Amino acid sequence: MAEKVAVIVGPTAVGKTKLGIALAKKLGGEVISGDSMQIYKGMDIGTAKVKPDEMEGIPHHLLDIKEPCEPFSVVEFQRLCRALITEISARGRLPIIVGGTGLYIQAALYDYQFSAAPSDEAYRRALKQLAAEQGAEALHRRLEAVDPISAARIHPHNIRRVIRALEVYHCTGKPFSEWQQGQSKRLLYEAAIVGLTAEREALYRRINERVDEMIAAGLIEEARALYDRGLRDCQAVQAIGYKELYDYFDGRVSLDEAIEQLKQNSRRYAKRQLTWFRNQMPVKWFDMTDAGQFAAKVEEISRYVAGKLQLEANI
């Protein structure tokens, strides 16, 4: 019998973390982070990582497991997440994956075989050199020209994934998005996939407010600590919230410009996340626009998940 898994996805700042904790309390669950940046130590504020005193006693997994310059891939996430699903289920608890990194979550839930993808080391090195000389945006424009679907899914600053998509196109003549569609889409688990959304104006307002809160909480100092350690070429510091402040530390933009760029990049990322989840996974959507209705939404979503997975719930 397939193991049961609840999944909470959606754009940044929509309230996934808070709902994940509430759902875990209702359904006897443990949270697995489905965020590719929250795995890194020392990157707490910029990744909106849940604080220990906010967890309300709910175990959280796949947080703070890597140093910022340690490599981490979707393949490793797939392995770790699946192992955790088995461990949590064996304890009689419900695994609840919470996050916004769609490809990572999809890879864990579905029968994806990444080892089948072709590779060309020399071509990869050439693309890395191109990125170093012309910048991440130039590399992303190249991907847009041959595979606009993958370009929409992959952030321009995620150089490693942009290169991987270009590499697959180079080796196969097929866009990476088309190659992925040829992969098995068999769901390995009995899953209830919940998506959180909000009206655009409300979501963008929350994003802007959260950036201001991050700045007040010490994001500049957090990013500066990474900068002062000489961490410049790591995948981690290309994340939204750090790349923009690195430009400020380098003197290329003012602090106000960096903060405005951070807000804009976060809003664009939220839009890409929504598009991806709507097109790639069988999601049951819930509107979280009215923050005053959070408790009612917790009840509604708990009932949906409990019904879908045939669980006994504390409702």
UniProtKB/Swiss-Prot annotation:
Domain of life: Bacteria
Enzyme class: transferase
One Gene Ontology biological process: tRNA modification
E.C. no: 2.5.1.75
Glycoprotein is among the record's keywords: no
Keyword line: ATP-binding, Magnesium, Nucleotide-binding, Transferase, tRNA processing
Name of this protein: tRNA dimethylallyltransferase
